[in-house]
Amino acid sequence: MSDSLLVTVLLKHDQSKNLEDIQRHMKQQDWWERFPPQGVELVSWTVAMGLGQIVTLRLPPSLLPALNVELERSAWGVFSTEVFPTYDFIPVRETIRERVRN
């Protein structure tokens, strides 16, 4: 079993708030310093226009509760959140490609 897992967090903007309101809330919550929590690796952070921010994190399973609490503490109020267990499909894809070639 791996000592870490990947988690993808979908942060959907609260469209009832404008950008200034969102940034004010994030500053008040110290979002940029607190997220992701210490010990959690930021793998990628992308924006999908019309959807929101998509953040992929690598963390030990023991830090999953800390991630949850930080999302509740800092993100709620300006984002709705969805969290998904994630894995790297590239090695699986390569295995399948090799199998179907033979």
Placement of each model-derived feature along the sequence:
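Short S/T/G/P-rich N-terminal loop/turn motif that feeds into the first structured element of a domain
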Residues: 1-36, 41-52, 59-65, 69, ...
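Conserved short beta-strand edge segments in small beta-sheet-based binding/regulatory domains
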Residues: 75-88
